[in-house]
Amino acid sequence: MSHATHLLGFPRIGAKRELKTLLERYWKQELDEAALSQGAKELRQKHWLLQKGAGVELSPVGDFSLYDHVLDAQLLVGAAPARFGFDAAALTTGQYFELARGNAVQPAMEMTKWFDTNYHYLVPEWHADTAFSAQPERLLSQLREARALGVAAKPVLLGPLSLLWLGKAKGRPFDRLALLPGLVAAYRELLSSLRAAGAEWAQIDEPILALDLEPSWLDAFAPAYAQLSRHAPKLLLATYFGDVSEHAARLKSLPVAGLHLDLVRAPEQISAFLPDYPADKVLSAGIVDGRNIWRADLSALLDRLAPLAQQLGDRLWLAPSCSLLHSPFDAAAETGLDPELKNWLAFAVQKLNELKTLKRGLEHGRSAIAGELSGSDFAREQRRASPRIHDPAVARRLAALPEGTDRRASPYPIRAERQQAWLKLPPLPTTTIGSFPQTPAIRASRAAFKKGELSAAGYRQAMEKEIELAIRRQEALGLDVLVHGEAERNDMVEYFGEQLAGFAFTAGGWVQSYGSRCVKPPIIFGDVARPKPMTVDWARYAQSLTAKPVKGMLTGPVTILQWSFVRDDLPRREVCRQIALALNDEVLDLEAAGIRVIQIDEPAIREGLPLKRAGRDVYLAWAGEAFRLSSRGVDDATQIHTHMCYSEFGDILPAIAALDADVITIETSRSDMALLADFGRFRYPNAIGPGVYDIHSPRVPSAAEIRALLDKALRVIPAERLWVNPDCGLKTRGWPEVEAALAAMVAVGRELREKLAQAA
């Protein structure tokens, strides 16, 4: 009996973020297109050979992308956004990046979260007359590359229903499903080309099956796949990120050769599929966690797999739960990590070995993997018994919290009056979201400090110089509420995690967020507490430089949770409450230091939502409680801000309002202020700062564009509750474009302020 091992996808960025380096050198015109193409090819080949060497029997092809796999899927079917005027059949590399990053004429495509992960995809744009045509050459070229290396390759495609669903209808209203026949025809041609090129299998991902879908979308699967299965390779329909058991009968009846199930997120769903599982289908068990970094309990997994192997025989395949895109590359490279903690970890490379071990155990018995099982069992018991995991003081503090302790003393209208009396802000106050450009000088100082080449005093002096520069530039621009610029911060989560008990950090545990943007999530391995203040000295120094209010800047508890690799031995709610209390200590210390505007960023609050409606109320209740716990006890005159991005809020606005932040800033420019309709219908009660320009693009907005967005905002939000700000932090931009964009933003804000005064 043999069980094939395969991957749904592999980290694109490389062991040392080679893709990031390639992209950024190309964008700076240090590499030409040929060098970029060759570098990407070499990276793909290195990854395929690594997988082959680790025993992976079917490697994914087409999961690699220069920017985003959803954008690539659009281009495979010839559907570049119409507003750019590009011919998808003759798209240049430069035009590809213009879609993702914008150009002088068109803003970049909208970007949003990939389901409940911290990866961002570019949102497809559909029009009623969108036409599709198969453009298979990129995929065929990569298939040829893999086969030339002797790699057994499995092309990977984002499925047509998911691609269509993930996009937005543009122009006149229409039903996106009206585009499905043309889209399916293009997919048929793609699949036919793959079959003709010798592909035995093709993986088609339909992650939307883990969502609450309307009947019309569900009903579209059977006829679509009836068409797709003709003249195609064997199709493996992949689902992930959640439970699809309610669709078991439908999925088992589809004319595909196999199904992939996420048995990490939803292990119980297997019971809905095993009865009467079709004899002509393989079942791919997503048994190794593709999204977290903890070492697998191999003994327990073998116990779960044994009955599946007995029933299915060779038709049982082994795989990670989802693409390893969401996993860091290689834990073996973490030479500076505590050895005990390192022994608990498995990154992408280690997960390949776990698959190989499980395969050997199923095929040859546990005695064949006795050493691996012993190591796995030891790591599990070592972690369970480790005294570093539990802090009794944290547990006592949580248990002692009185009921209702997360509520502000007074309602928003009273707080707003007291805050205005203290802050004396003009109408339409201008501010930024927090970070300013991380210049080469800043990065060099931080690197030198971490290497011991720069003393603590020297580092503080360098950072204070950058803070003063940021304050002076903001004063010159005329902003009303200033920020210190976060020069001292490497990452909005890592910075805090480095100073909190219960966190650990890797040197190379990077994962892709979007394009060349990578993040290095901290590891929450134990109880969380704040040993000492984290931001107070920097904020106090910044405030000493100016008479204008300076915001204290914190990352919120839900975002720290969502953007970390979280311990799996405690409910996420409890971990989040621990983080909230640690942050509350910081908030109260900031207030005591004279900081009267404190921003608690929660850009990730929506991505924590369960993908299905069941369970969302429970999540939103504890997420809201955690946010309020983090700001509990502050004076009415202290203004609490929060920031959220890449989100659709319509269905969770009551929960957002329940956070009771005095000011919420949101990312809206890429969606042309579409989010504001939701806020208007809901009559959001507190102040709002909708982003007036897109910081993810190097393009500097015109005053006319900013004015148009603010005019839209003023139709929905009363002027006395409207703030003027960019979409997000400015860390990744350069100072010339930042100053130009902010100057335009401040000028438009003042212009509208004068109009309001005249109208009054």
Curated annotation (Swiss-Prot):
<dbReference type="Pfam" id="PF01717">
    <property type="entry name" value="Meth_synt_2"/>
</dbReference>
<dbReference type="InterPro" id="IPR038071">
    <property type="entry name" value="UROD/MetE-like_sf"/>
</dbReference>
<feature type="active site" description="Proton donor">
    <location>
        <position position="696"/>
    </location>
</feature>
<feature type="binding site">
    <location>
        <position position="601"/>
    </location>
    <ligand>
        <name>L-methionine</name>
    </ligand>
</feature>
<dbReference type="Pfam" id="PF08267">
    <property type="entry name" value="Meth_synt_1"/>
</dbReference>
<keyword id="KW-0479">Metal-binding</keyword>
<comment type="function">
    <text>Catalyzes the transfer of a methyl group from 5-methyltetrahydrofolate to homocysteine resulting in methionine formation.</text>
</comment>
<feature type="binding site">
    <location>
        <position position="607"/>
    </location>
    <ligand>
        <name>5-methyltetrahydropteroyltri-L-glutamate</name>
    </ligand>
</feature>
<feature type="binding site">
    <location>
        <position position="486"/>
    </location>
    <ligand>
        <name>L-homocysteine</name>
    </ligand>
</feature>
<feature type="binding site">
    <location>
        <position position="643"/>
    </location>
    <ligand>
        <name>Zn(2+)</name>
    </ligand>
</feature>
<feature type="binding site">
    <location>
        <position position="601"/>
    </location>
    <ligand>
        <name>L-homocysteine</name>
    </ligand>
</feature>
<feature type="binding site">
    <location>
        <position position="113"/>
    </location>
    <ligand>
        <name>5-methyltetrahydropteroyltri-L-glutamate</name>
    </ligand>
</feature>
<feature type="binding site">
    <location>
        <position position="645"/>
    </location>
    <ligand>
        <name>Zn(2+)</name>
    </ligand>
</feature>
<comment type="similarity">
    <text>Belongs to the vitamin-B12 independent methionine synthase family.</text>
</comment>
<keyword id="KW-0489">Methyltransferase</keyword>
<dbReference type="GO" id="GO:0008270">
    <property type="term" value="F:zinc ion binding"/>
</dbReference>
<keyword id="KW-0808">Transferase</keyword>
<feature type="binding site">
    <location>
        <begin position="17"/>
        <end position="20"/>
    </location>
    <ligand>
        <name>5-methyltetrahydropteroyltri-L-glutamate</name>
    </ligand>
</feature>
<keyword id="KW-0028">Amino-acid biosynthesis</keyword>
<dbReference type="GO" id="GO:0009086">
    <property type="term" value="P:methionine biosynthetic process"/>
</dbReference>
<feature type="binding site">
    <location>
        <begin position="433"/>
        <end position="435"/>
    </location>
    <ligand>
        <name>L-homocysteine</name>
    </ligand>
</feature>
<keyword id="KW-0486">Methionine biosynthesis</keyword>
<protein>
    <recommendedName>
        <fullName>5-methyltetrahydropteroyltriglutamate--homocysteine methyltransferase</fullName>
        <ecNumber>2.1.1.14</ecNumber>
    </recommendedName>
</protein>
<feature type="binding site">
    <location>
        <position position="728"/>
    </location>
    <ligand>
        <name>Zn(2+)</name>
    </ligand>
</feature>
<feature type="binding site">
    <location>
        <position position="667"/>
    </location>
    <ligand>
        <name>Zn(2+)</name>
    </ligand>
</feature>
<feature type="binding site">
    <location>
        <position position="563"/>
    </location>
    <ligand>
        <name>5-methyltetrahydropteroyltri-L-glutamate</name>
    </ligand>
</feature>
<dbReference type="InterPro" id="IPR013215">
    <property type="entry name" value="Cbl-indep_Met_Synth_N"/>
</dbReference>
<feature type="binding site">
    <location>
        <position position="486"/>
    </location>
    <ligand>
        <name>L-methionine</name>
    </ligand>
</feature>
<comment type="pathway">
    <text>Amino-acid biosynthesis; L-methionine biosynthesis via de novo pathway; L-methionine from L-homocysteine (MetE route): step 1/1.</text>
</comment>
<dbReference type="GO" id="GO:0032259">
    <property type="term" value="P:methylation"/>
</dbReference>
<keyword id="KW-0862">Zinc</keyword>
<keyword id="KW-0677">Repeat</keyword>
<feature type="binding site">
    <location>
        <begin position="517"/>
        <end position="518"/>
    </location>
    <ligand>
        <name>5-methyltetrahydropteroyltri-L-glutamate</name>
    </ligand>
</feature>
<feature type="binding site">
    <location>
        <begin position="433"/>
        <end position="435"/>
    </location>
    <ligand>
        <name>L-methionine</name>
    </ligand>
</feature>
<dbReference type="InterPro" id="IPR002629">
    <property type="entry name" value="Met_Synth_C/arc"/>
</dbReference>
<dbReference type="InterPro" id="IPR006276">
    <property type="entry name" value="Cobalamin-indep_Met_synthase"/>
</dbReference>
<dbReference type="GO" id="GO:0003871">
    <property type="term" value="F:5-methyltetrahydropteroyltriglutamate-homocysteine S-methyltransferase activity"/>
</dbReference>
